[in-house]
Every structure is written in structure tokens, then in C-alpha cells.
Amino acid sequence: WDYRQEDPVNDARGTRLERAAAHPDLLTDAPQLNITNVIAPNGGRIYVDHAHPEYSAPETTDPFEAVRYDRAGDLIMRAAAAKASETTGRKIVLHRNNVDGKGASWGTHENYMMLRSVPFDLVTRLMTTHFVSRQIFIGSGRVGIGEHSENAGYQLSQRADYFHMKVGLQTTFDRPIINTRDESHSTDEYLSLIHI
């Protein structure tokens, strides 16, 4: 992975956070040694994110293709677990979740390219309700309420308890619904990325 394109302190709202003032977890642009980080056969990416394997689907402009890539990720990870089981002689089991009920949450991101000329506050004002309310229809749910599952119950969203603000630059603490990190990874300067 080419970390030279990472710029975790560049905010899509037109500001930059000083590196010295940034929480260490925010500085994700330093290469991580001894971390699995490969390009999948379908053009996606498989890497370790905070001790969890993560699959990142390739880019697409077609929602049906996005679903196929998502399913392909399941198959790729299942094959990797089977190979690891065979190699180590120990059964490797992967679970598709993004919370552990003990305070940790990971994965499940979306990225959308948009024109940089579109005001970021307009996008957040128009899209936040959609990103929150769609859990009613497509949420995978979880048992337990609270970051540490301190209360019994069932929720439609696995990650609802882990969001603490509407918009923000950070990704690993005080998580926002919409992340403002300005890293489009595009050579076109007129494009921006919205990270969910």
C-alpha cells in the first residue's frame, strides 16, 4: 500500500489539523511494518486494521456491482481462512461483524467520490439522515446495547453506540457519522471523497 497518498490531517471542510495536536490514532499515514496488506484478486484490498482482518472492495459506480464485490469479499476471506486452517492445522473461523461488545469497533466504511465544488456542509446536511435511517431497512443488528454491551437488548445497527458526533476528522475515537478527512486518492483535483 502506498502511504504517500495518505493525509489524515487534511480536513474536507478546508482546514488542516496540526500534526502535533493530532491524537496518535489519527496519524494513519505512517507505514506499518509486518502488517498483512495485499491487493485481492478482484482489485480489492485485504489488510489488518487494529488486529482485525479487513476487506476493502474495489471502486465501482454500479450499486449491483458493489453488492457483488461485497459478496466476493466474503468468499475471498472464507478461502483465506480455509487456507490458514490447512496451513496451521488449527481451525480458523471468521465472523462478519464490526463490534466486539467490549468497547471496540472496526471496519464497515463507505467512500463516495463527489465534486469538490459541492459544499461539504450541504452534503452532510442532506445525507446524514439517510445514513442514519437506512439502518431500519438494512442494518445487520446486534445483541447488546452500549459500547460494552452493558445492557440487554437488540439493536438494528451494530455501530450506533460508537458514533459520538455528526461530522469530524477522527476515525478511531469520538467517531463521526461522516468523516471529513480529505483523501480522495484521485489524480483529479476537482474530486473529493466523502468517507462514511
Task: Identify the role of each PLM range.
Residues 98-99, 103-115:
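Histidine-centered divalent-metal-coordination microenvironment in nucleic-acid enzymes
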Residues 154-157, 164:
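Long intrinsically disordered, low-complexity regulatory regions enriched in proline and serine/threonine
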Residues 91-93, 109-111, 153:
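Beta-sheet entry/capping signal
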Residues 1-95, 104, 125-150, 161, ...:
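Terminal catalytic/cofactor-binding subdomain
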Residues 118-123:
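Short, conserved charged micro-motifs
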